[in-house]
C-alpha cells in the first residue's frame, strides 16, 4: 500500500446528494488509484444540526456504493475520535498555541456591522473583515464583553500565500486583502471549520485532500495555519462543482437527487457509472463499481470548469 491517505469529511446535516457523492467518488479513486487508503471524518462541529443518525446513514450509503472508508467513522482507528464533535479538547490545545503567539483577539461585531456598505467584499460576495476589533484596548474589551459575548478571530499577515493545486493549478491569495482576519471560535465556544479541518487532517495523517472548488479560496489561510501550528500540510485537489441541469448548485436543502431517491431507481453500479461519465472518467454512462474505475483513473480526464449534469442522466 502506498503512503497516500485521502479522506472524506462530510457534514451530516442531511442525506448526501449527487454533488457530495461525486466528491466522495473522486476522493476514493484518487487515493485508491495509487494504492492508498481513505479515512472518514464526520464534520459535525455543530452537533445540533448534525444528528448522529445522519452520520450513520452516510456511512451505510458509502458502503452501499462501494466507497467504504478504510478507517474512521464508526469503524474507528488509531487516530480517532473521528467525529469533530468529540475533538474539542484537541482543538483547544492548538487554539491555545495561537493565543500564546498573540494572534487571537475577541470580535464583538454583529452580522449587520460585518455586512455594512463600507466593508470590502470579495468577488464571490463574502465579506473581508475590516479589522474593526483588532486593536481594541484591554479597557474597551472589558466594557464590550459586559454587553456581548465575543467570537474570536486570528490576525493574518499582509502576506501572499501561493500553492499549486493538483487539479486546478497555481493559486494565490493575499491574506490581508483577500481573506482578512477570520474566525477561529464562535461566541458559544464552538471551534470554526478553518481551525478544525487543519488540525484534523494533520493529526489523522491525511496527505491528499479532495474537495469542491468552492473551498479553493480557503486553502491559503489553511496553509498559513499549518505553518503557524507547525503541522504538515497535505496536497490539495479541488474538483469542479456539480450543477443541476439549470445551472443551479445542488443542495441538501432542496433535496437535489438525494441518495434516498436515487436508491429507489438505480443500482450502486448505475449511480457510480453515471457520475463517472459526468466527470469525464468514461465515455458512456455504463454501470461500474469504484474498483473497476480505479486502475484507469486520471485527474487529467476531469474538467476544471463546473460540471452541468446532462439532462436525463439521473
How does the language model describe each region?
Residues 1-15, 33, 38, 65, ...:
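Non-catalytic terminal extensions that flank enzyme cores
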Residues 112-251, 258-262, 311-314:
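Active-site cores that bind ATP or allylic diphosphates and position pyrophosphate for catalysis
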Residues 46-56, 244-246, 295-303:
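Short, mixed-charge aromatic SLiMs
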Residues 82-97, 121-128, 148-158, 278-293:
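Short secondary-structure transition/capping segments
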Residues 1-122, 213-214, 218-231, 288:
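N-terminal Rossmann-like or analogous alpha/beta NTP/dinucleotide-binding catalytic cores
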Residues 60, 93, 116, 131, ...:
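Charged/polar, solvent-exposed surface patches and flexible loops
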Residues 55, 88, 111-114, 126, ...:
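Alpha-helix initiation and N-capping motif
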Residues 17, 81-89, 146-148, 194-199, ...:
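Noncatalytic linker/hinge segments flanking ATPase motor cores
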Amino acid at each position: 500500500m502506498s503512503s497516500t491517505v485521502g479522506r472524506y469529511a462530510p457534514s451530516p446535516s442531511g442525506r448526501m446528494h449527487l454533488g457530495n457523492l461525486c466528491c466522495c467518488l473522486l476522493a476514493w479513486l484518487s487515493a485508491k488509484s495509487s494504492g492508498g487508503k481513505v479515512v472518514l471524518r464526520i464534520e459535525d462541529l455543530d452537533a445540533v444540526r448534525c444528528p448522529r443518525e445522519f452520520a450513520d446513514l452516510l456511512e451505510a450509503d458509502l458502503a452501499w456504493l462501494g466507497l467504504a472508508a478504510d478507517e474512521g467513522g464508526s469503524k474507528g482507528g488509531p487516530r480517532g475520535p473521528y467525529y469533530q464533535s468529540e475533538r474539542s479538547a484537541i482543538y483547544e490545545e492548538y487554539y491555545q498555541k495561537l493565543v500564546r503567539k498573540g494572534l487571537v483577539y475577541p470580535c464583538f461585531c454583529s452580522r449587520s456591522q460585518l455586512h455594512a456598505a463600507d466593508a470590502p467584499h470579495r468577488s464571490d460576495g463574502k465579506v473581508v473583515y475590516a479589522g474593526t476589533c483588532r486593536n481594541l484596548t484591554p479597557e474597551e474589551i472589558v466594557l464590550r464583553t459586559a454587553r456581548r459575548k465575543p467570537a474570536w478571530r486570528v490576525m493574518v499577515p499582509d502576506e501572499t500565500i501561493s500553492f499549486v493545486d493538483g487539479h486546478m493549478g497555481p493559486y494565490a491569495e493575499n491574506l490581508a486583502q483577500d481573506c482578512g482576519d477570520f474566525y477561529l471560535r464562535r461566541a458559544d465556544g464552538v471551534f470554526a471549520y478553518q481551525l478544525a479541518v487543519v488540525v484534523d487532517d494533520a493529526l489523522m495523517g491525511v496527505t491528499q485532500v479532495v474537495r469542491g472548488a468552492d473551498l479553493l479560496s480557503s486553502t491559503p489561510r489553511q496553509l498559513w495555519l499549518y505553518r503557524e501550528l507547525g503541522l504538515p500540510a497535505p496536497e490539495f485537489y479541488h474538483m469542479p462543482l456539480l450543477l443541476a441541469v439549470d445551472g443551479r448548485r445542488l443542495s441538501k436543502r432542496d433535496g437535489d437527487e438525494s441518495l434516498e431517491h436515487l436508491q429507489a431507481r438505480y443500482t450502486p453500479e448505475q449511480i457510480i457509472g453515471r457520475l463517472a461519465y459526468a466527470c469525464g472518467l468514461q465515455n458512456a454512462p455504463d454501470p461500474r463499481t469504484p474498483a473497476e474505475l480505479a486502475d484507469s483513473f486520471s485527474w487529467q480526464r476531469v474538467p476544471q470548469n463546473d460540471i452541468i449534469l446532462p439532462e436525463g442522466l439521473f
